[in-house]
Amino acid sequence: AMCFGMPGIPCVYYGSEWGTRADKSQGDPALRPCFEQPEWNELSEFISKLAEAKKNSEALNYGSFRSVLLTNRQCIFERASGHERVMVAINADEAPFTAHFDAGCGMATDLITGQPHDFGGGSELPPYSAAFWKMER
């Protein structure tokens, strides 16, 4: 999720979209196994949604970057263009996290899930989760 939210072109290493694991100690060919027919899975679906959000968001493609909240396990940053603001929120912890910050608006839509998000009372991030909140203007 971080790669798709940050400025620049996201890079997904060959096989990562399928959740393939490899050991680098076995050499470079082990990192690029052949796929006869990869199986679409939960990770593939998530990466597909991230790519779709990036593709369709002016802010994620061309917007400025501003750090909003940073801990050892969570980060929230804003990408803003002339027409759009998106808050990228990531929780890399096994516990839920409630973030308190000034969003500058009351509601947003998560570009990953399509669900509305209410900033009132804090923003809860489930364990090991990400959200791309497109802010209402």
Question: Where are the language model's segments positioned?
Answer:
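Active-site region of glycoside hydrolase catalytic domains
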Residues: 1
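Carbohydrate-interacting/catalytic domains
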Residues: 4-137
